[in-house]
Amino acid sequence: MTSWLLRKPVWVSLLLLVLVVPWFFVHLPHSWRSPLLLAVWDLCHILFFFCVVYAVQWRYKLVSARSWFLVAALAFAVGGSIEMIQGMTGRNASWGDVARNMTGVWLGLAWGVAQAQWLRWHRVLSAVALAVLFVPFINLAVDRVKSFNEFPVLANFERPVGVDYWRGDVSIAAVPGRENANGHALKVELNTARYSGFYFEHFPADWRGYKRLHFDLFNPGEKSLTMVLRVHDIWHQQSGQAYGDRYNVRFQAEPGWNSYQFALDDILNAPTKRDMDLSRIQTLGIFTMNLPQPVTLYFDNFRLEP
């Protein structure tokens, strides 16, 4: 019995190629590069190589072990070379992309010919590989749904995947003294650079209807630190990220636990030439300047309050 795919003409595969190929040459704006969208982007490697090999299989019926080996070797060489070139030109090289390429090749080879007894395990293994590579996407999709369901909580760090939405030297860890409390926080390593901190993006952007931004901070050190909170909306890029076009405020991180509240009216009125668009908040950042030595801080319970 032929598979569902084999009952479809090869133009389905070619049509998918036409739809997928342009995306390899599109430069996404930074504001669009959410972890979830990048995970979808990664899966396009599987779809692309599957479509190419499936179309070749439909036309030439590659069934010998030698032909399969040659196709796989060629795909590995091409994909690996592209990743090496990207690494040498300052772009991110990813062997995960090579694994996705090879999974697409394997799927195309195994499903592009008529059913045969010897193909059964190839198809099972290729399907398992596909499922494994879908796990990060599924985790991010589930986390995204949970983040919207938990809003106005922006982040509480009880889900490991949540760290994907933060930029900086950060990790999710237990706070010293609370290791047995089943509570986690964002561990931030600050260095001695002129500006050292972190940024939070791709959270629910509509902050209208709330009055305060709240978060907690634990400073395990013995000295107070001067920190800066900055918030901007999606239109901030149009100003060239001018200082006067965003919200900036200093606050003190005293030793031990600290709780902070910042009025959203102040964020609304912060830009000098316009109002902040509270329906399109894009980035929240916290940083310090010119530390004499590295410092570790813990942040928790980012949320909006009525």
Residue ranges and their predicted role:
Residues 305-306:
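Short, solvent-exposed mixed-charge patches
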Residues 194, 223, 237, 270, ...:
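Residue-level signal for secondary-structure boundary sites
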Residues 217-221:
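Asparagine-centered strand-capping/turn motif at beta-strand->loop junctions
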Residues 215, 259-302:
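Extracellular beta-strand ligand-recognition surfaces/modules
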Residues 1-96, 102, 107-195, 201-205, ...:
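Bulky hydrophobic segments
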